[in-house]
Amino acid sequence: GDKIGRKKSILLYEIIHIIAMIGGAIAPNIYVLYVFRLVQGFGLGALLVVLFAGFTEYVPGRNRGVWSSRNSFIGNWAHPICNGIAFLIVTTGISYNMNWRIQYMIPSVLSIIASIIIAKKLPESPRWLEAQGRVDEADAILTKIEKEIEASTGKPLPPVTEEPKEVKQLPYSALFKGKLLRRTIVGSLVLIGMNTIQYTLMTWMPSLLKSMGYDTSQSQFMTMFGLFGAPFGIFIASLIMDKIPRRVMGVILLAAMAVLGVITGQQTTMTALIVTTFLLNTAIYMYVCYASAVYVPEMWPTSAKLSGSGFCNAIGRVSNIFFPFLVTSVAAGSMGSTGVFVLISVVAVIIGVCILIFGVETRGESVEDIGNVD
């Protein structure tokens, strides 16, 4: 992404995951599906990094958190919508051999539509073009945008007097020394917390509810209802993201998750579980928005933005490969499902302390100021 540009990267990874999803939908057996799932994960994992990190270059520092949160708000409606589709498919009696294939085809078609819109409408990041020494191309894009603004407002924009500065190209090794090393560590920890907590709840909630005596339809319904906390939480985050310092925001959200995790684990009735799961999801997805859409993507210089954000996301994903084994062990122990919620709380506390001690402040700073690591 740092080499070929933001727009080309988005389209490349869209194509990869679209092909993989269509291939998965028509897979003749589980082994072919494994292969397509692997390719799909590669495409989607890379796409998330490019989308969120690249977007920070298109908006000003004073309200970057709000706009990034709005992006996340729209995107995270996918979770309750997908669970709603799954619930409908299960209850309508579509065969097991077809229901998951339908789940694959729906987002693949939507992704094709999104790719066409991106190809036609999204300009390349002027900041990335400038970092590559392609100043004339960057100027042409911004000039076009300025003319559109002047035409819509009827007012001329002030002239630009600042000359373009030479952008220092940073090697990949720069992530592991000097000021960037601290950001690499903090970003990795922030996303380890996000992945382990978010995916534990998403992946294990139906199984946890089933272990508590609820049937498949009941657990699917409760999970779907709880996941409406996702867009609600991100909507709240979009309203306050640029009003609270980034470090403080992270610590508050992690503390809320720790408390709500313990409370949720103590509930025994369906109504109480739905309410507490909704509140827990609200806090979790406020943190997801904070971590994946705002804080980690914005803490890097332009020439290392996708490298840094990509590395931290990779570490977060790797932790999520191994964490389910710990969850399985805890769930099988004496505390059962309650132990899983306690585990979520412990992870939240540990990450919160790390952000409080080592976190860097980026709220309101321009991309250029954040990128000054000399």
Stretches with model-predicted labels:
Residues 1-374:
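Transmembrane-helix signature of 12-pass secondary carriers
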